[in-house]
Regions:
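Acidic/histidine-rich catalytic cores and adjacent linkers
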Residues: 2-19, 27-31, 47-158
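Short loop/edge segments at beta-strand edges and connector loops
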Residues: 24
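Short, surface-exposed amphipathic charged segments that create phosphate/polyanion-binding patches used
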Residues: 34-45
């Protein structure tokens, strides 16, 4: 079953359907990554720095030349925001991985970096990803989804 990363839903599914394979929904995972990264950007804005939003949220391959330059500046001058952006992009790569081994290697690298992060908000995010590691890795080539995220949410809430 594909679900968002809510512990209560995961526990309920495991209790009601113990044989069900729980998969962390990639859409919700990347949405959460974007939200966390944008919060790090807003923290910097509160200190008086103006950081553009789109270079951080867009897929790097889709950036305009100007946005790519803005992203390079952010990476150079705003370490915490750059760390959140790196994790977000690496998480995208987990879902783009062509093999389970590649996905696991990328996720392990994320977990290692998050564990030693200088930003206090990045450490608990890393712990959340670690708790959901198996469910995140369950969704990539070679795996399968049993239903759409919305359908699973309706069923698990019903």
């Amino acid at each position: 079953m594909t679900i968002d990363r809510k512990e209560s839903r995961k526990k309920r599914i495991q209790r009601v359907l113990p044989e069900a394979r729980v998969v962390a929904d990639p859409f919700h995972g990347l949405q959460d990554a974007g939200r966390r990264m944008d919060e790090a950007r807003r923290v910097e804005r509160r200190t008086g720095h103006r950081l553009p939003r789109w270079p951080l949220l867009k897929n790097e391959a889709d950036l305009t030349e100007r946005q790519a330059k803005e992203l390079a500046t952010i990476r150079q001058h705003f370490r915490n925001v750059a760390q959140f952006h790196w994790v977000k992009e690496q998480l995208r790569d987990v879902y783009r991985a062509t093999s389970p081994e590649e996905a696991k290697a990328i996720l392990d690298r994320i977990l290692f970096e998050a564990e030693g992060a200088s930003d206090a908000a990045l450490v608990p995010w890393g712990r959340t990803l670690k708790r959901w590691k198996n469910e995140i890795l369950a969704d990539h080539p070679g795996g399968h989804r049993t239903a759409t995220p919305r359908a699973c949410t309706r069923r698990s809430n019903g």
